[in-house]
């Protein structure tokens, strides 16, 4: 991870999802939600896909499991039926998907053409754009990771942020207009934590700010309440406990289970 870069001193601090943690979370979520165990991987053929392939394989290995198959697709592919057919033939009962909006939509459309109804657990790629428009009604069947949702009951910080966004941007009428939600939430908490680090440092000197991050105590943030989020060994403020699993419902990203 970029936060574990071997630099000394290390100036990289992060408020976001971490691939290796997401990969473990995908496996846990599939097991707990769908009660399945024969996992197939369908991954975009680029460094992001390769990194998550290694992470998911490692997560499975830690559970004494292995994937029934691993298939890749190009970002420009418009038909992923051959790869999916091999995964179905191998006995996959759940798919782990990593890819951005367009390629992920092609996976869903290919599943539709095959008539294969199979759970799809995804990284957050589908959340970044016009997924429902590109994938069609079956976009709803993809469960993907998020770090925050503006839907549902909000904390006082969440209510304050939504009100501020509505006041500043007239096009924002409600949670469905805040996109991408994770980008807003991650950036909001990251900037607030940075401000606290500068406050602790009493200056804008880089070394002082780095030490200031370690001195942050409690912060009631948007994503969660942070308690000493950073140490010299830990530069990631979020863990798997902070992730939200979501799905598209009528072009809205809702936490799984909230859909009516």
Regions found by a protein language model. Name each.
Residues 1-69, 117-144, 150-151:
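Extracytoplasmic ligand/sensor domains, especially the bilobed periplasmic-binding protein
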């Amino acid at each position: 991870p970029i936060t574990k870069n071997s630099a000394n001193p290390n100036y990289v601090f992060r408020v976001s999802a971490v691939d290796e943690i997401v990969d473990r979370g995908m496996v846990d979520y599939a097991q707990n939600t769908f009660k399945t165990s024969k996992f197939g991987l369908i991954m975009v053929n680029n460094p992001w896909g390769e990194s998550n392939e290694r992470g998911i394989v490692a997560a499975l290995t830690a559970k004494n499991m292995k994937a029934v198959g691993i298939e890749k697709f190009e970002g420009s592919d418009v038909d992923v039926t051959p790869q999916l057919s091999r995964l179905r033939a191998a006995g996959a009962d759940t798919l782990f998907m990593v890819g951005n909006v367009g390629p992920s939509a092609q996976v869903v459309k290919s599943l539709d053409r095959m008539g294969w109804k199979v759970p799809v657990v995804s990284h957050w790629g589908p959340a970044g754009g016009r997924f429902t428009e590109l994938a069609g009604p079956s976009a709803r069947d993809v469960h993907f990771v998020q770090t925050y949702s503006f839907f549902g009951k909000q904390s006082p910080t969440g209510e304050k942020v939504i009100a501020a966004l509505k006041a500043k941007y007239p096009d924002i009428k409600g949670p469905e207009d805040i996109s991408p939600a994770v980008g807003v939430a991650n950036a909001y908490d990251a900037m607030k934590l940075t401000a606290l680090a500068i406050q602790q440092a009493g200056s804008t000197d880089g070394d002082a700010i780095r030490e200031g991050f370690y001195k942050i105590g409690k912060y009631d943030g948007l994503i969660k309440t942070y308690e000493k989020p950073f140490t010299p060994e830990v530069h990631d403020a979020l863990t798997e406990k902070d992730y939200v699993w979501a799905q598209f419902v009528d072009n809205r990203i809702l936490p799984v289970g909230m859909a009516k």
